[in-house]
């Protein structure tokens, strides 16, 4: 209801569209956020057009819009519809979710100087827009803006001034973008999910986190310990039809899935359950997997070698079995921190059942918040 009220106040759903843009102000490249009052700047333009998907609304999006607000009296933001957005790949937020986040930010930042519309085709209103006098673009989208101006010429309209804005770099050295966020590399401010100071270090879990790890990190499917197929069956029924990589952690969980005809894309095992060696009949068949790797990771720790293997496994196109010499219980932490959004992580919860987590931004934030409490050595 709150979203509908916001939409009624701020948005007119019209079939309008133009070019997709990502951008920032050059001030950010000097290490500063763009903070001067938007009301105190002399503006050169009346109405600026902005277009984009605005998935995982991030700092680059904010600075793009701020650039337009600094140079135009009024802005029109055109948001790609669901059908067009899905051509960019999976795990893109719905139009409603993207609109809600954008509108919330605009209401605090742009006051009454904006409209928001739905973008239903590549060019939309730009070729025939009679009141717009500028458009924002990055170097990649400038050619499309020239196409728009050619169509405006054919329609007897003056060209739009093209405001070129540079990209914003994330802390890993790439361009801050929604696609890199969906790939699980960075958050919406461009920060990596594993702090750089933790790279190459042995991470030891402090005792104060014991209770935290007793809380399931996803949806719990209950079932008896001596019949794991009960919980696993319920989990598989809840598994989305379209999902990312399936990662299973723990011998009982991995073998249970395999016995039910489901081969995880990535499996982590250590040959134990409750730190006791498994009977030979309960061991996972390694020959079922296309690739196998071994790694040392002592109990209560996360090693750099395990992190390297997790990253490697996530890049593979074939199934991977990772045999851990030590303990794999904490492996989900590295998976949650490094895997793309939409990845499915499944692991056993002692005496309760099986946990399934569909990797989203909330799960990544929780993983990072826990990791920063680990003691880094080396």
Where are these regions (language model features)?
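Nucleotidyltransferase catalytic core that binds NTPs
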Residues: 1-233, 240-242, 251-254, 258-259, ...
């Amino acid at each position: 209801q709150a979203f509908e009220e916001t939409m009624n106040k701020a948005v007119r759903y019209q079939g309008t569209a133009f070019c997709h843009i990502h951008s920032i102000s050059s001030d950010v490249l000097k290490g500063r956020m763009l903070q001067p009052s938007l009301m105190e700047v002399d503006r050169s333009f009346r109405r600026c057009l902005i277009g984009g998907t605005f998935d995982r609304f991030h700092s680059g999006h904010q600075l793009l819009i701020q650039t337009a607000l600094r140079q135009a009296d009024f802005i029109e933001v055109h948001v790609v519809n669901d059908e067009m957005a899905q051509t960019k790949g999976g795990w893109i937020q719905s139009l409603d979710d993207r609109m809600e986040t954008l509108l919330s930010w605009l209401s605090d930042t742009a006051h009454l100087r904006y409209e928001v519309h739905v973008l239903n085709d590549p060019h939309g209103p730009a070729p025939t827009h009679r009141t717009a006098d500028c458009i924002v673009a990055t170097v990649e989208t400038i050619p499309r803006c020239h196409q728009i101006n050619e169509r405006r010429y054919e329609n007897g309209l003056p060209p739009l001034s093209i405001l070129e804005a540079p990209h914003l770099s994330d802390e890993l050295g790439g361009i801050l973008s929604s696609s890199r966020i969906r790939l699980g590399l960075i958050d919406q401010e461009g920060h990596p999910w594993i702090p750089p100071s933790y790279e190459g270090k042995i991470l030891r879990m402090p005792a104060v986190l014991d209770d935290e790890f007793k809380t399931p990190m996803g949806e719990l499917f209950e079932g008896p310990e001596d019949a794991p197929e009960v919980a696993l069956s319920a989990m598989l029924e809840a598994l989305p039809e379209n999902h990312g990589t399936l990662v299973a952690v723990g011998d009982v969980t991995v073998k249970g899935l395999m016995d039910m005809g489901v081969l995880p894309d990535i499996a982590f095992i250590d040959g134990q359950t409750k730190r006791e060696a498994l009977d030979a009949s309960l061991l996972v068949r390694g020959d079922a997997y296309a690739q196998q790797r071994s790694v040392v990771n002592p109990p209560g720790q996360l090693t750099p070698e395990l992190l390297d293997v997790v990253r490697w496994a996530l890049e593979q196109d074939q199934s991977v079995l990772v045999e851990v010499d030590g303990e794999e219980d904490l492996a989900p932490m590295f998976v949650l921190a490094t895997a793309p959004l939409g990845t499915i992580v499944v692991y056993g919860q002692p005496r309760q059942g099986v946990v399934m987590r569909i990797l989203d931004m909330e799960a990544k934030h929780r993983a990072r918040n826990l990791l920063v409490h680990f003691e880094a050595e080396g």
